C-alpha cells in the first residue's frame, strides 16, 4: 500500500500525463488544512478562501515544476504562503489572527474568552512574520520541524531558532498582560 506522499506523486504523474481528474483527490486531501492555515495567517475567511483557491490553481498550472522528491503538501504550502503574503502586503492594518480560546458557559465567560483572544492576537501580531508563521505551523497546524522547514524553505535550525525567539517574546508579552 502506498503512503500519502507516494499517492500524491502518483496523482501528480497522472495529471502530468493528461488526466486532470487526478488533481481532485489532491484538492480534497489538502483543501481543509491549507484553508485553515490561510485563515490563521490572514485572519479573514474570505481572503483565506480566495488564497487557497488561487494556490490550487497555481499548483495545477505549475505541476511540471513539482519536485517529486518533495512532499506535495510542502510544495503547495509554499504557493499558499506566497499568496497569503501577497494579500498581507496589499492590506492596510492587519486583521486579527483567529485564535481559538472559546469558553463555554455564561456570557461573562464568553466575554472573558473574547478578551483573552484579543490579547493573544495582539501578542501574535507583535511577532515578526517569520516568527508568527512558525508558531502557527507548529502549534495550530501541528507540523513537525522538518515539515515546517520544507514548507518555509529554511533549515530546521532556523525553524527552531524562530520558534524559540517567538516563544520567548510571547512569554514576555503575555506576562505583561497577566495571561501567563
Task: Label each region the model flagged.
Residues 61-68, 78-97, 113, 165:
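Arg/Lys-rich amphipathic alpha helix in sigma70-family domain 2
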Residues 134-138:
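A short pre-motif secondary-structure segment
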Residues 2-4, 14, 113-114, 119-126, ...:
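C-terminal edge and immediately downstream basic/flexible tail or linker adjoining helix-turn-helix-like DNA-binding
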Residues 16-17, 43-44, 54-71, 90-93:
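Sigma70-family region 2
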Residues 58, 74, 81, 85, ...:
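DNA-recognition helix of helix-turn-helix
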Residues 1-4, 16-25, 35-54, 156, ...:
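Short, charged helix-capping/linker segments at alpha-helix termini
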Residues 36, 50-57, 70-82:
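Structural recognition of an alpha-helix C-terminal capping motif at a helix-to-coil junction
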Residues 1-5, 86, 93-117, 122, ...:
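Internal acidic/polar
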Amino acid at each position: 500500500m502506498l503512503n500519502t506522499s507516494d499517492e500524491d506523486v502518483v496523482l501528480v504523474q497522472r495529471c502530468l500525463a493528461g488526466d486532470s481528474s487526478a488533481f481532485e483527490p489532491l484538492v480534497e486531501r489538502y483543501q481543509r488544512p491549507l484553508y485553515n492555515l490561510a485563515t490563521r495567517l490572514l485572519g479573514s475567511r474570505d481572503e483565506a478562501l480566495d488564497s487557497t483557491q488561487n494556490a490550487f490553481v497555481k499548483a495545477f498550472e505549475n505541476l511540471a515544476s513539482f519536485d517529486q522528491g518533495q512532499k506535495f503538501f510542502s510544495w503547495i504550502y509554499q504557493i499558499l504562503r506566497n499568496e497569503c503574503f501577497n494579500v498581507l502586503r496589499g492590506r492596510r492594518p492587519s486583521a486579527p489572527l483567529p485564535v481559538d480560546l472559546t469558553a463555554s458557559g455564561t456570557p461573562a465567560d464568553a466575554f472573558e474568552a473574547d478578551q483573552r483572544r484579543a490579547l493573544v492576537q495582539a501578542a501574535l501580531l507583535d511577532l515578526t512574520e517569520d516568527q508568527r508563521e512558525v508558531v502557527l505551523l507548529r502549534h495550530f497546524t501541528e507540523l513537525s520541524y522538518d515539515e515546517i522547514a520544507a514548507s518555509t524553505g529554511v533549515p530546521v535550525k532556523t525553524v527552531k531558532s524562530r520558534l524559540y525567539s517567538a516563544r520567548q517574546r510571547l512569554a514576555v508579552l503575555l506576562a505583561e498582560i497577566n495571561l501567563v
